[in-house]
Amino acid sequence: ITGIYTNLEYDDGNGMQMIFLDTPGIHKPKNKLGAAINETALNTAGGVDVVLLIVDGTKKFGKGDQYILDMLSQSETKKVLAINKMDLIGPEAYLELYNKYDESGLFDEIFGISALQDTNVDRLMKCLSNYMIEGPMYYPEDMATDHPERFIVSEIIREKLLQYLDQEVPHGVFVEIESYDEKPRITE
């Protein structure tokens, strides 16, 4: 999924546009599909200005996280880490996670954020903009993604299925929406 962030006030009104490529999650593959997903994520990491890894601050660092770090170490691209959900954890838990990721030596910068509370998100975006190579704006200023809303809804449903059914459902889940009633937006 491509996410598009446009800030027309950036750089004294010259504006900027960041394009985020949400890759499939890196994980220890159990089959060919899993290996292909990892390969896609790593190939994407090699063709961008900066890699942003967002981790859930409420979860302990585990073997899967170490596997992700090992895979990311194969890319020479600059890397920034965002430890999300700072509003739900205490300073000790944050420091423990921060130190664990910092020990890897992979990250050029590490941020504690709360996407929900909008804590440090501006600082993170400013940091990311420092790694961007100047270029044209590829998308209209009001565009937030290159996918239709129906696709986004199916991806949210798929994500929730995988989240709540955990080991019961393979990663090869496909969601087909048979009926969809698009209503005017209340919020963006």
Q: Where are each of the predicted segments found?
A:
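Long, well-ordered amphipathic alpha-helical subdomains in the mid-to-C-terminal portions
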Residues: D142-E188
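Flexible beta-alpha connector loops of hexameric P-loop NTPases
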Residues: I26-G34
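Conserved substrate/cofactor phosphate-moiety recognition/catalytic segment
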Residues: I1-T2, P29
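Conserved C-terminal guanine-recognition region of P-loop GTPase G domains, centered on the G4
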Residues: Y5, E9-L21, A35-F111, Y164, ...
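Canonical P-loop GTPase G-domain recognition
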Residues: T77-V80, M86-F151
